[in-house]
């Protein structure tokens, strides 16, 4: 099994004063900056696929912590991992994401199926509408303010600088937050 280290600052767009509300983590986390992924070597479609996988993994972890989801027994996890043919792991923000090379490039895997970029893109467009472009542009500016190795080291702390305030615990599960594009841009300027 090959292991590659890679970072997606997918969570970074989930914050502040965004005109369209988005659900914390699962929706906004998917709207990661594809230019960051390209800067680190992955193309836009690869980044969309991997970002969706990480958002799902993080949502599952939070759900387990809150008692909403029950953990899967270790034996089942191992069995599922063995069924996946030529997969490898990609580390994204400290998470091990199963991935596979397809004819279209690297794709994250969910339930033994590659996550297709087009479906993730449609989802993001449906949630963010015409503001998707400006959110990506702000993240592009933020990503350009750092060298890739700095992003690998500081991705989550950057996210913490502008993540939305939502209720803790079960009350915050699925809560909506705002995206403050100006705050994201200011972080790039502060750098």
Regions flagged by a language model, labelled:
Residues 2-191:
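Solvent-exposed interaction surfaces and binding hotspots enriched for charged
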């Amino acid at each position: 099994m090959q292991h590659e280290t890679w970072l997606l600052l997918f969570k970074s767009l989930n914050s502040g004063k965004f005109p369209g509300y988005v659900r914390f983590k699962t929706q906004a986390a998917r709207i990661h900056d594809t230019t960051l992924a390209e800067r680190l070597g992955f193309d836009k479609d690869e980044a969309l696929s991997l970002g969706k996988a990480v958002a799902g993994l993080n949502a599952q972890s939070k759900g387990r912590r809150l008692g909403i989801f029950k953990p899967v027994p270790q034996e089942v996890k191992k069995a599922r991992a063995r069924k996946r043919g030529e997969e490898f792991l990609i580390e994204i923000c400290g998470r091990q994401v199963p991935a596979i090379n397809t004819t279209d490039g690297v794709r994250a895997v969910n339930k033994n199926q590659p996550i297709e970029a087009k479906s993730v893109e449609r989802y993001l467009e449906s949630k963010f509408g015409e503001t998707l472009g400006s959110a990506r542009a702000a993240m592009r500016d933020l990503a350009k303010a750092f060298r890739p190795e700095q992003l690998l080291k500081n991705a989550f702390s950057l996210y913490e600088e502008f993540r939305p305030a939502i209720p803790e615990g079960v009350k915050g599960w699925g809560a909506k937050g705002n995206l403050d594009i100006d705050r994201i841009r200011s972080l790039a300027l502060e750098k």
